[in-house]
Amino acid sequence: MVYKCHDTFMVRTPAFPLSVARNVLATEKSEVWNYIKKIGIDEYMLEAIFVSSPSLYDAILKIGKDNKKDQATFVSLYKYLLRASSRTTPIGLMATVGLGHFSLDEESYIEKKNNLDKKIMISYSWIYKLVKELQQDQNVLDRISVVWNKNTYMTSSRIINPYFANHGVSEQNEHKNVSIKSTKLTQFIKDNTENSIKYSELIFSICGIYKGVCREKIVSTINALIEKEFLFTELRIPAYCDSPIEYILSILRKNNINTNLQYNLKKILHEIKVYEEKNGGVQSLKKRKIRWKKSVVTNCT
């Protein structure tokens, strides 16, 4: 197969030109905030720092009240500005990208534009936490579908999940093996979930075969398989998902689950859209952050 390189490519860029870094290096740390205001990037810096370091944002607002604390604030600002103008950074509004073009010129350069399109991406750690809490709600489970994790494998007496990620919410970001004892019940569940099936239908099928087993034990077994990721629910975010919230909303709508949560998630999407379209500044972002928290952050289900 023959591949041809496209003339246009995407490149990560510093938020500010290299000339800013040179000027910062020649500036006393105690004067860095005055320099930021002088070149007219104070509003942008405030917004970017509000996203990446709320504590530093609060400290900037208090400049002039405590000289000792001011000096620590200036040092932090100095480091932020130096990094943002000398190398790419992976966080918040400092994580800028641009489009480049191949040319015959030997010298490369970055053309700075006056406009900046801002895009917001919801933290996946919050998304995973929301999904996990939904999957711990029996009323939700009773309405959604499950499917067997194809990455698992059998040994003589156990079923192994070689990649347990704790639904993406592990603080240590650790992945480990987990295993369960292979029984007739777990084998029946595995055989009947090779393709997606409603949780409630799976319960019904098991109860029809294992009439002497109480329903609570069957539910407990299935829920344990979900917890250990031997079973995936349809709430699991697929790879390369453009909008996790839209995906979760589609599952909630399809199965008529938690209309209050649906409403709040729609509000978040609307606030994000308005902020991006209006290219709002720090005050706009602060107002929306407060409304997001009131919507679902404090109580996602």
Feature-to-residue mapping (PLM):
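Short, positively charged loop/turn segments that connect secondary-structure elements
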Residues: 174, 207-219
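Catalytic cores of nucleotide-enabled group-transfer and carboxylate-activating enzymes in metabolic
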Residues: 177, 181, 185-191, 204, ...
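Elongated alpha-helical scaffolds
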Residues: 184, 198-204, 216, 220, ...
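Extracellular/oxidizing-compartment recognition motifs
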Residues: 164-179, 185, 224, 231, ...
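Short capping segments at the starts of secondary-structure elements
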Residues: 190-201, 211-213
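Type-3 copper protein
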Residues: 1-121, 220-301
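Extended, well-ordered protein cores
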Residues: 68, 74-182
